[in-house]
Each structure stands twice: as structure tokens, then as C-alpha cells.
Amino acid sequence: MEITTTIIIANYNGLKFMDECIRSLNAQTYPNFRTLVVDNGSTDGSVEWLKEHQIDTIFLPENTGFSGAVNVGIKAADTPYVLLLNNDVRVDEYFVAEMVRAIGQSERIFSVSSRMIQMYHPDLMDDAGDMYSVLGWAFQRGVGRPEKLYKKPPLAGIRISPP
């Protein structure tokens, strides 16, 4: 079985989230992935927990932020696909399968994202995907809006052909 995906989790003092995050990844229906945690110099017991649970981890000496950590993870990944997660995430059992299915639909797709629902308010969106204006301004779709409004992909049923 070929591993196709590396799931990179940035962690900084996130021990209180780690167990639930890892358990949700262990429950995936798609088996062809590896989990790699990049720890940003945690001091809350995360380092010991990751070692005790034998989680594949790169330990950084200081906090490099989310982008610094995931960039280290991306450089270490040896798979065609990478998924980037924060440590305070729980995913449903089809998450990896759906992400791999979505990106595999066309060689022209270079990035996919999922709906993110607020953990403590599961009827509200945290993020329904990043959007960019023609002027290059970035914004998040759906923040704080009802989750039920974001069931379909933003461009569901629309084909865009190059000129």
C-alpha cells in the first residue's frame, strides 16, 4: 500500500487538543497517509506526549509559527499530497478520502480545502474556503455564518475553461 498523503500538524503548546486530533485521524477510512507533527518548541508536555505515543514528529527548538512549522513539514514530506492542519482540529472519518478524491479529479487542480465548522458552535462556520478578489485581496468565506448555507463547493456545477 503506497502512502499518498502526508498530514502535517503544526503544534505549539497544544497538548490539550492533540489526543482528539490524532484519534480523529486514526479513524480515517482512507488508509494511505502518514501523520507528521511539527512541534514549535512546546513547553506544556506536548513533546513528552508525542514521544510517548510514538507520533512521527519533528521537534523545533523555538516557535516558528504555523507557516514556519508546516514549511518544515512540507520539506520533509515524500508524498504527492500534503494536508495541513492545526492541532485543534477534529476531522470526520471521510476527511482524507474526500480531500484525495477532490484533488485527484484533474491534474489542473493544485489545492483543495474543506469546510471548517466552529468546534464549540457546530451550527456555525469557521471557514468555508479562502477567496481572492480580482485585485488580489484575500478573505474567508462564511465566517460566523450558519453551517447549513455551505453544503456545496463554491463552484459546484460550474466549469471554467481557459481562453
Name the predicted role of every residue range:
Residues M125, W137-F139, R145-P163:
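A recurrent flexible, glycine/aromatic-enriched loop bordering the glycosyltransferase active site
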Residues L60-A77, N87, E98:
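Glycine-rich, basic loop-to-helix element that forms the pyrophosphate-binding segment
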Residues F33-G41, I58-L60:
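Short beta-strand/loop segment that forms part of the nucleotide-sugar
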Residues R90-S133, W137:
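Conserved donor NDP-sugar-binding/catalytic core segment of glycosyltransferases
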Residues R23-N32:
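Short, acidic, metal-binding catalytic loop of nucleotide-sugar glycosyltransferases
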Residues N13, L25, N40-G41, T64:
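Conserved short acidic donor-positioning loop in nucleotide-sugar-dependent glycosyltransferases
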